[in-house]
Amino acid sequence: MHKSVWSIMLALPLAACGGDAPAEVVEDADSTNNVAEAPEVPVSGPEMDIVAFGNSLFAGYNVDKEDSYPSKLQNALRARGVNARVTNAGISGDTSAAGLQRFAFTLDAQDYEPELVIIELGGNDLLRGLSPEQTRANIAAMIEEAQRREIPVLLMGMRAPPNYGPEFQQAFDALYSDLASEYGTALIPFWLESIYQDPTLFQSDRIHPTEIGIERLVAATVEDVQGALPDSES
């Protein structure tokens, strides 16, 4: 990876690791490493199936699968009484273009109709030189595919580092809120907000969160995820 790219990543952690992994349904994790060690309220209601679709930030780069964001999110939702099942459909290295290529196939491969799909893509687009317009078009196509199937969408927004210049940064940062407004989706404007300024919450590559960093992300976003579920009560 070129030195200039490393300076970009040091300015703002982004997801950028190769290697593919199939989507998998998260299994119940050992409570020792969970955000919530025991349910705070009894789990009740119909099962809420969620597809967590993204890159290495979802796939769980260099952490055990029970410590990935989707796994810890499932545990946190269940601790709030939500009968959640989260499928980890994160693949390390995915750009929005790669995500679009597998999006419909991933939904087709599920043995259920999900109540929510979380789309977390865009970080690798910055490193691969995709324009904000390309990223926007790819994510828009995924939203349209989900809405064609009547599946609600939650967008996990990213931010461009200042190294790209103010014009690019403004265009990239705005694409998530613009898409959420245009398509009426739920949105977390910058889903790394709770950790990105603390280097101790990242692995040595300064890109991927540690287990503690992932726990912090889940704690900061679980309410938004619950609120994006149909007929959910926050």
Q: What name fits each language-model region?
A:
Residues 22-29:
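Sec-dependent signal peptide cleavage junction
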Residues 1-15:
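Sec-dependent bacterial lipoprotein signal peptides
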Residues 29-92, 104-113:
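Serine-esterase "nucleophile elbow" of acetyl-processing enzymes
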Residues 13, 87, 154:
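Conserved Rossmann-like nucleotide-binding pocket used by diverse enzymes
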Residues 17-21:
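Bacterial signal peptide processing site
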Residues 57-60, 64, 90-95, 124-126, ...:
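Short histidine/acidic/glycine/proline-rich micro-motifs that form metal-
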Residues 100-234:
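Alpha-helical cap/lid subdomain in secreted, periplasmic
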